[in-house]
Amino acid sequence: MQNGQIVLATARDPELYCPDAPITLVNVEADKIAEARAQQSVSGCPLFLTLAQEELILREPAGQLVQHYGQKLFAQLWTTRGVRFMFERNAELPGYASGISAEPDVDHWSLGSLRFIQFHELGEHANFDPASIPAYTKNGFERVQNLKLTVAEAQFASQFNGSRSIQQIAKNLRLDLKFARLTLFRFLALEIVECWSPSTAVKPERKSILLRLKRSIGVGE
């Protein structure tokens, strides 16, 4: 993080960070990749940045891989219980992060992370009552206008009017209910919408990962 903007997400466990072999590394010698992974386990520097510094891969695809795997890594937190954020204040970013462009829009970066989640990974988060009614939060409608949504996400968001149930939205868009729940989870996690029970007028209180993250980095609620 820098000035409330997300630079990258990484881990000192290179296998957790990148368990597969990206096609970009197909021409890189295995021992060089192993060395880059070993360095990541010590410094946290994403292996792609190390390989780029050694001119084994180009910087542009390296930056794209850093964003891809960082968001994929962070995606695991959205469905995990008891997540707490701990921050260390430093005068400057680690040297390896100096060439990475920060993402000024936390919502945009977070949505990219949420797209990595598959339905089977939702667990109890998939247990939405089909009769529940999604409705925009206080500033949800304004925020959703600034997001770069996919066509499917934009169509889904257009159905939020405070009276349509999840089941009705799925029917209107001819969606499988599982896909509807997965898409809804993204908007709930971002606090764009909240779900109301058709049988109660009590507004549910949500303390999401996004809210805790924004408070921690000093971004407005």
Could you say what each language-model-derived stretch is?
Residues M1-E221:
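Acidic, Ser/Thr/Pro-enriched low-complexity segments and adjacent helix/loop capping patches
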